[in-house]
Amino acid sequence: VFEGAENAPYGWALRDAETGAVRFGEYAEEDLGRCMIGKIDPATRGLQVWVKEVYDCRGNRLPLETPGTNMKIYWAGDLSTQVTDGRDYLHGPKCGAVNDLTHGTMLMPSGTATNNGTKGNPCLVADIFGDFREELLLRLEDDSAIRIYTSTDLTHHKLFTLLHDPQYRCGVAWQNNCYNQPGYPSFYYASDMDFANVLPQLRARPTVYLAADSTVQSYTEAEAPQTGWGQPLWRRPRGANL
């Protein structure tokens, strides 16, 4: 877990999610505001973290320009991470541009405005239309409407909508509270990801229609609530890899 803190001894730190032990971090005398994590450098293994500077997953400082920390977004088709807004837009409700460390500015949504002053948050970032890229929701400058932007960046990757992941779905809900931090999927999302590790518990189960209450559930035949409940809508072939 990568966190930006307000007090000593750590101004920011990467902690073990299970134990809370610090893997690496740095002292800071002041509140550093916000921090972020994502795949912004395709040449570096794993994810990168940044607050004042950019670091790799082992805590080594990288010679990269530090992106903004307003909100991350999965916008590009190469499974990398982008940010909405940035350092040029911290002085008021400016438009929520989508910036990328290698691709440059990928979207400049003119006529829109961000929220929460210096935090520069969009109304929402979420994968609401399917695909695996996220949509960007921004209000118009005159507050007359909300505009939805979706990526047109071509991709050869195929992945179901991120809302199938329970952790990501919860993250979309908490985006609208307090500091509006981005949600992340429970699996490793990056340009070097192994698709075999994406929600294996969903791939390994047939989907069964339960006629008793008209709902769709997913379980193996051995786990059926009682004999004769439902018929499989789709049965995973033996030995199939999806």
Describe each model-derived feature in a short phrase.
Residues 202-242:
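Serine-esterase "nucleophile elbow" of acetyl-processing enzymes
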Residues 1-200:
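Extracytoplasmic/lumenal domain signature
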